[in-house]
Amino acid sequence: MRITLALVTGTMLLAGPVAAADWKLLTFPDQGFGIESPVPLVKGAGTYQAAVAGRIPTVTYSGELDNIRYKVTIIDISKRPAEALNLFEEMEALTELQGKVIGNDSMGIEPGKLRQYGRELVLQAKDGSFRRIGLMYSKGKIFQAEGTVLPGGDRESIYPERFADSIIFDLDPKRREERCADPNNFKTPEGK
């Protein structure tokens, strides 16, 4: 009995869960951002179109693994600084129309004084996909980091959230490490 139990347990341990994806920080200095991804992201192009924004060319980086699509879309609005807030809000509003909104919350990245805030949306899309989208504005660009569980994929996966929340704009690893090591960078204004 003990031998059988040991063999069954050993077999289960050896089989184990599917190996977790190997996540890496990918940096794109030409666009001024970095993001963690389990797959290489391939550069592409597209067009963002909206009533206020009009037609704006986009740069995209995307990849797919295990029925999850990872994509970053960059919209350069640096020539329209006076409209930045309105264009950001328009993008958020139009994104919400792409499915049933399950969540819409603020998100913050980078610790300390370099902290930046944006929006995070969770949608059940009309095509059955489950989308987690981080919208951030930095240095004249709107960044949309999106992890999408495609129809038939694992909706319980944490990977879309990890991807969307991992975007960074400070590409200096030493400076990031120093900021992350300083406990004062994680206190509230009241010092808590």
Please describe what each predicted stretch is.
Residues T58-F88, Q144-E146:
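A short acidic-to-branched-hydrophobic micro-motif
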Residues L41-V42, L87-V101, K141-K192:
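Surface-exposed amphipathic alpha-helical segments
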Residues A6-A15:
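Bacterial N-terminal signal peptides
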Residues T47-T58, A84, K174-P183:
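Short acidic, Gly/Pro-enriched loop/turn segments at secondary-structure junctions
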Residues G16-A20:
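Sec/Tat signal peptide C-region and signal peptidase I cleavage site
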Residues E36-T60, E92-S138:
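Signature of long, low-cysteine stretches enriched in small and polar/charged residues
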Residues A21-P40, F186:
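Short N-terminal segments immediately surrounding and downstream of signal-peptide cleavage
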Residues M1-T4:
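Positively charged n-region of N-terminal signal peptides that target proteins for export
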